[in-house]
């Protein structure tokens, strides 16, 4: 069958009516409606990224007047900068320890409070308080707690040990990681607890009752019914906290400023020092780009895992 | 002809009279002008264009900024009609703020407080206005010469041009307990042990001996031989002083290779750590306030710090509301003042007044800082009990009003006056903070138990890396200019 003049072929070969003037106007109107949003998205999302990439190939140091392009120099420096990779390692150490501990403590607390115990609402509200505190304030408080002269922690240890104790929590290499981790875990375990409490509340009670009637052990019930039910929430919680821990800054800054030396310097502190104390703007742009790539890869991988979990 | 001649001679007489009158009046005017103070000249010049305008000045947050907020700002407005807006910035952020505003070109700041060690960086970036033309135009050069030599010769110029007026005589002074040093039992026991008199130490070896002796003897009374602020930012400055006093040099002037890891450096770091043994437990965490609290509480016999310690220890205006955070002094009247061992105290930090090159009212900004820095006004400012500005002009050290502030104020000012002759400059290069940061990290590792040699080797490597990045020749030129200053290294 011959096509009518002016008619368009559809994907199945069938003739499609050409767009009318009204249709074209409607499509244009729709595009006009979304255009500002797209423009804003490009402005706040894509432009900074592109500009970041451009800057990373330049030589902007804030105090240097020659800011011309210098090719891959910043990336070569990045590859050989031991302090950067150490900072990345410190960050990973914090993630590797804090994340599972927060998850386990959060889950244990959620299990405890899923039961209707007396005063539950009050306890839950109190337990959530640390999350409401600004991390820099939490860090400053923990700095006082760990103070060698006036801090209660040394006093308590002193009472237990039966002699005056003046442990330098934020100076001695063996104590500094535990100090930071205690503060970090104290502040963010309640976040895990809240999410997991909500997830546990959504577990089908009838399945739990059926398992109980069948005589399934607590562990078996937890592993076979509860864990699969809350797994997507765990995955999201771990992802959020993992990303949070990757940009760990405030508590470490308040407690040690990355010291002793650079022993507890995280990637965020390193970036801050390079960018805003030493004004190595272009080098910091290269570091920021590295962080974006690493985080994007991690998030992409994690999201795939979440998808698989479903 | 006679008439014509007579008229000519009459005209000549009139001309001579006029010239003479003009000369006399010019001389009178010039005399009056030179008699007028630099402060008054600044006020008179500002009055002409100041009404209704506002000058914005960056000042260190906290006590320091009470000076422009409570004293100099309102007074300037009263005299000239020009308002003063004070932007308070914590010390650690001042450089960043100044650079950011300059790069953004906002012209938000007119006048600045800058740490002299930052000047090469700020000048290279173009953030500071050259003040020479303003100084000449407003007749301030003579008064600048009356700034104490160490500050005047070391903290005012970059590449031979004036970029800031030294405005704060920050220097490390040695404070000791006169009553403890005068105790006959201690004097006798000390002499018997070390074979010299118990007196303020002249060398670091003597300091170590006196410190450990006093701790051994007085610890049962709750008194330690000494306490210092040991937090890395402070200890880094103390290391800079002591390293040079002991003969150390930061760089090889030919190759610009760092020599901070020389045997002198290693010895100084080792001794610094060993000294902590006769200081209060946890001294590694002492900052300005912690050390002050211990000293004012009478728990240590010796310390080193900035000039306000002397005023606080004397209890000078302790009822001042702004100083309510200062612990009550239990040692008023018992404190002696001296130069630290070696006799070359660190001119630790300090402030200079500058004009922002991006200011839209540079003339007014300049007039304000000239007025602040003048003999007349600065002598009032350094006596403000709350503002932390320390004496920096020759006249401040002999100021009769200041000498009467407390019984030992005369000795205090005399010690400061001595320090103003022999003080040592903070290291000042392009990207100084990177060099400082490496040292701060090194000190932090030292308190954590690191090996002094390994620590200084790492510091030297970081310094060399920074020098390479800045450019060896470029940095060498800046270092040579710095090293040529009278306060860079002690005279042999």
Q: Which stretches of residues belong to each language-model region?
A:
Chain B
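Immediate post-signal peptide segment of exported/extracytoplasmic ligand-binding proteins
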Residues: 35-56, 77-78, 159-161, 214-222, ...
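Hinge/lid segment of periplasmic solute-binding proteins
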Residues: 36-49, 116-173, 205, 235-238, ...
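Long, aromatic- and glycine/proline-rich binding clefts that accommodate carbohydrate-like moieties
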Residues: 39-43, 329-338, 383-446, 475-492
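Extracytoplasmic "Venus flytrap"/periplasmic binding protein-like
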Residues: 71-147, 164, 184, 294, ...
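Extracytoplasmic/periplasmic solute-binding protein
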Residues: 154-168, 172, 199-257, 300
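Extracytoplasmic/periplasmic substrate-recognition and gating elements
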Residues: 160, 266, 270, 276-281, ...
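Glycine-centered hinge/linker elements that transmit conformational signals in sensory
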Residues: 204-214, 248, 253-285, 332-336, ...
